[in-house]
Amino acid sequence: MFCVQCEQTIRTPAGNGCSYAQGMCGKTAETSDLQDLLIAALQGLSAWAVKAREYGIINHDVDSFAPRAFFSTLTNVNFDSPRIVGYAREAIALREALKAQCLAVDANARVDNPMADLQLVSDDLGELQRQAAEFTPNKDKAAIGENILGLRLLCLYGLKGAAAYMEHAHVLGQYDNDIYAQYHKIMAWLGTWPADMNALLECSMEIGQMNFKVMSILDAGETGKYGHPTPTQVNVKATAGKCILISGHDLKDLYNLLEQTEGTGVNVYTHGEMLPAHGYPELRKFKHLVGNYGSGWQNQQVEFARFPGPIVMTSNCIIDPTVGAYDDRIWTRSIVGWPGVRHLDGEDFSAVIAQAQQMAGFPYSEIPHLITVGFGRQTLLGAADTLIDLVSREKLRHIFLLGGCDGARGERHYFTDFATSVPDDCLILTLACGKYRFNKLEFGDIEGLPRLVDAGQCNDAYSAIILAVTLAEKLGCGVNDLPLSLVLSWFEQKAIVILLTLLSLGVKNIVTGPTAPGFLTPDLLAVLNEKFGLRSITTVEEDMKQLLNA
């Protein structure tokens, strides 16, 4: 086992990465190794998808499957080894079908890629794990060095984050052939184990640029189906009655669950990255969408144990449900998996609803505590002139984009302290689950404009980018000249690709934490600092002083 893709990876003087029987996320060595095997199979599939496009062959089954299967290897998504192997077998079957299509056009069709003809050696998981050793990401570290390995992983993990957003968009009916062609090209190239530093750096920027387009079609999918989010108050306390909790990012799953629970007497609560769903008109119209439950994903083993109903996980993040003994009432959807947990293959939630009706639910309603969400792209753009007016009248000094992933590391209290230290004449724009560090606190307003503005999920960084570009255009300056600072927390691969997106768009002087990614060497961090001004957090006092005086 070698995995260094998330923030909680093991860090030692000898090197970074989980490499024992089990990773810090709870992923076993077996599952981790089989995910490496799956990635190799997907690289071979992409190699043939690139070749097929040369013949004008576009296979939509391949295009929809490839990013979805890659998504299953993202942190805290799928811990079920047999399902990972199932994805690998499906990748190979699709590859062979695509290969046959190519050969039907050109009998001499060939692909020069080491993954192009990969076959699984056995049905036995142990044998497959041994085969996977051939594809462990650091297998040639001694030959290429830590810097090349780190850049490869930056590209691989960034592309994995983009693949997750591609799947979210695909679920909502969004498809862009250019994006899929670019995805396959990059995925296939990474399967050749590239070792050129400049080429890898260029690839990382290409991934960021591609992901901006992915976030654009995801935004179109969400707003097209569920309307543009508008500011909405959400109760974060319990309401009496039977209940279901839904977590993850998939708004379509939430919509289907709301439709199917309507009139059943079962209330629905959002968790984690589902919180922004309350801002969408077509979702909040369901009166039994009663509130948001819990805090950051890392607290779920305590909070889910206390929730008196079933829980549905639609995407990341799931962690071991046996710890809180709620594994008999947590359900996985789509690419999510945990051994022994019931999985919903389709969009029928009747079994979950039946379980909710058999459980006690909340015995009484607590005193409501309301927070505000729903500052989507349209709302943010509508406030652009107000922001400019406040700045011109010196009522608004600075905007801090304070967002990203949450996690268990104690140093993450920095983000709470930073938010509460922001001066009263400054605004906080937040997104993703890092907001749970401070989103239940009171921040007041500036002439009626809330000082805490929740823009949505991690992918809604797109809205923040569009706002920044709009403000810059109206003020006749560059984005980096705005009174705007980005202070981002990271945990997994979606955050990595958001960072690459920002860097590829030329955004500079981003501050990140609580730690640097374990796969980025001091040399690589120095390169990113020199090219983009990217740096790690220090203390709240020092960072606040530097950012306000920038």
Curated annotation (Swiss-Prot):
Q: What is this protein called?
A: Hydroxylamine reductase
Q: What is its main location?
A: cytoplasm
Which reactions is this enzyme annotated as catalysing?
Answer: A + NH4(+) + H2O = hydroxylamine + AH2 + H(+)
Amino-acid positions noted as binding hybrid [4Fe-2O-2S] cluster in the UniProt annotation, renumbered to this chain: 249, 273, 317, 405, 433, 458, 492, 494
Q: Which gene encodes it?
A: hcp
**Cofactor binding comment, as recorded:** Binds 1 [2Fe-2S] cluster.
Cross-referenced PANTHER family: HYDROXYLAMINE REDUCTASE
For [2Fe-2S] cluster, which residues are the binding ones?
3, 6, 18, 25
Per its database record, what is this protein's job? Catalyzes the reduction of hydroxylamine to form NH(3) and H(2)O.
